Amino acid sequence: MSDLPLPPAFRQLGHSGIAVSPIAWGMWRLAENGRTPADAAKLVHAALDAGINFLDTADIYGFDGSAGFGDAEALLGEVLAAEPALRERMILATKGGILPPLPYDQSADYLRKAIDDSLARLKVDVIDLWQIHRPDILAHPYEVARVLDDAVSSGKVRALGVSNFTKDQIAALNHFLGEKLATTQPEISPLRIDCFENGELDQAMMLGLTPMAWSPLGGGRLASPQTARDKAVADALDAVAQAQGVSRTVAAYSWLMAHPAGIVPIIGSQQAARIAEGAEALKVRWNRQDWYAVLVAARGERLP
């Protein structure tokens, strides 16, 4: 029963040369509930103090259907303006390309503006990782690539990524890019296992992309499983969690991190203790039998 390797203290972000923690903190809900810059600063410190240096946001975060576009970036920008030294401790990722109500715009003019606007809201000179949030079917990948390459060559962006792209969309964009993609961000969790068998992670390994997993806890379904399948997955995670003295949440993060593609789960919580807890996943060791037990539970049938 062979053990799988523990994740390294830092992962390389694709071929970019940027080193990131093997787990990230996401700020989808940072601007909710009247959170102040002081409140947000406590969360940033919680992540950094736990060794989580990879922070992921997006220009759409904060939008409530009528207002709030850019609010999460702007709130983080206030934190960085008040404590400039924090910027040197983090790898900062953001996303753009969703523009309600269109819903997507990756025209050259809009992409340039989106990057500049994010820089302004974040109050930074450079974005470490800029990602296209969702694909615009009306945008030619050649034109998109030109804008992204320009953003890198001008020093506004260090590395490039995509989110919610299909394998073919990744291949098409990467073909035209001079500065090749460093990351892909699909939904991955013990309850969302498509990418393990549909070739997405195989492509990531082939191209040297770092997969970033959004919603790694299945949108809260792992915390309160309702279906027989979800309960079976939770039970399989609990077997390892209880043996190693961690929570089911931590076991779920570590299960993703054990995959050879180097998946980086994105913590979605906006609670300091839950953010810090995520760092415990680096210490959880999986063996093949236990890892496959989770996969089999998620599939709902035995492997062939």
Curated annotation (Swiss-Prot):
GO terms for cellular component: cytosol. It catalyses: D-glucose + NADP(+) = 6-dehydro-D-glucose + NADPH + H(+). InterPro entries: AKR, AKR_Detox_Biosynth, Aldo/ket_reductase_CS, NADP_OxRdtase_dom, NADP_OxRdtase_dom_sf. It comes from the Bacteria. PROSITE patterns: ALDOKETO_REDUCTASE_2. D-glucose binds at Y61, H133, R134. Keywords: Carbohydrate metabolism, NADP, Oxidoreductase. Signal peptide: none annotated. Belongs to the aldo/keto reductase family. This is 6-dehydroglucose reductase. The gene is squF.
